[in-house]
Amino acid sequence: MQNLTDSLNPSQIEAVTATEGYIRVIAGAGTGKTRALTHRYAWLVNEYGISPSNILCITFTNKAANEMKKRIKAMLGEAFDTSFVATLHAFCTRVLREEISRLFYPENFIVLDNVDQKKILEEVYDEMGIRMDTASFRFMIDQIRYYKNLITYVSYLADPDFDYDTLTSDKPSDEIMFRYIKKQRKYFGLDFFDLINFTIYLFRTFPEVLEKWQTRLCYIMVDEFQDITAKEFKLIRRL
């Protein structure tokens, strides 16, 4: 295993070897922030014996996560589990696979991609006798995103006895949305908006679950922290 600080400058070494409290690294593009983050991960494992299963390392794309895993394994070896080096959506999926039964969903719930969302919307449009084209699909995805900025809808989906007929509106887009989430529940499907919302709702509703994950995660590191949303920040703060 290589010496973890050989390729680092003094500022990077300071960030890598700091182990207590909040650490904020401010630097421009291409200055080695990600290098410092991956080396800090390796430093915690090698020098302090922290298990990789106790370190959460968040990045924003699967490509970036895979690159970080590659760098970490180059320093530590292939045997180390880097499954907690992931996007926030992937991490939330991991949490929900363990905990979502509390919300009356099966652990093998479906993660809905754009194709799945379109199929569900096509079903809704057929039921309502509406023609769906590319423009209307994009519009409804934007409406779903807007609607799901509020987490209150999760309580409907988490209640197996919820009566969806109580959700009414004169706006066609609202009616489509209500039918969409009803079908989501029928298929036990969560879209990308739901993954974070369900995790926040779960942590808020079941303090013992939040405490479990807070205890498990000794260190949390976030790449490109300046790009996170307010909701993502709320989730990270809870942890």
Residue ranges and their predicted role:
Residues D6-T17, G21-V25, L56, A64, ...:
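Conserved helicase NTPase motor core
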